[in-house]
């Protein structure tokens, strides 16, 4: 069994503001290609969080890949109870829809948000309950994933825990490949 934690930037950090944004199409294309390789190499659990951005897009891509790879399991772990409860109705509905579709979901802390320790406990849970991590993150462009990046690097100093970064160069290569396939008449919808 191989369990992959995948996280990364929030949607606003990537300037993606809508499901029809061309940047989102490229990100999902890159995630699909990457996760397909991971599945074919033995990953059977894709574990992500519920944050708006890479985490929710990862869950969406994982659910789509289950049609081709029914053995794949998708889990969403949330840092605390009532996660997303302060979001607008549309974002709350998107989260609830994803939670209803994944194979497993649970909060690491059942309590609503109380303090930053819950976020640290969430990170610790994720690294100790997965076999590897992938971050859509570029260390030259810090953001929210910096905390996960630092924790994973420290954890991997004392544990066999591989980290893969999907950085902006990787995303640019994916954008080029996506554009080339579109120009050749390949339909991604």
From Swiss-Prot:
One Pfam family matching this protein: YpsA
InterPro entries noted in UniProt: YspA
Family: Belongs to the UPF0398 family.
Protein name: UPF0398 protein lp_1753
Naturally occurring in which organism (per UniProt): Lactiplantibacillus plantarum (strain ATCC BAA-793 / NCIMB 8826 / WCFS1)
Taxonomic path: Bacteria, Bacillati, Bacillota, Bacilli, Lactobacillales
């Amino acid at each position: 069994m191989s369990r992959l934690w995948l996280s990364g930037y929030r949607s606003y950090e990537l300037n993606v503001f809508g499901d029809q944004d061309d940047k989102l199409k490229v990100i999902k294309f890159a995630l699909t290609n990457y996760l397909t390789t991971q599945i074919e190499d033995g990953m059977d659990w894709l574990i992500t969080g519920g944050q708006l951005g890479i985490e929710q897009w990862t869950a969406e891509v994982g659910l789509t890949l289950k049609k081709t790879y029914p053995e794949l399991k998708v889990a969403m772990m949330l840092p605390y109870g009532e996660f997303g409860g302060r979001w607008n109705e549309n974002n709350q509905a998107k989260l609830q829809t994803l939670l209803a579709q994944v194979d497993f979901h649970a909060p690491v802390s059942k309590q609503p948000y109380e303090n930053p320790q819950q976020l640290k406990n969430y990170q610790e849970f994720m690294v100790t309950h997965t076999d590897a991590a992938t971050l859509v993150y570029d260390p030259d462009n810090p953001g929210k994933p910096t905390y996960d990046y630092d924790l994973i690097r420290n954890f991997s100093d004392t544990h066999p825990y591989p980290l893969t970064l999907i950085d902006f160069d990787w995303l640019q290569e994916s954008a080029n490949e996506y554009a080339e396939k579109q120009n050749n008449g390949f339909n991604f919808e």
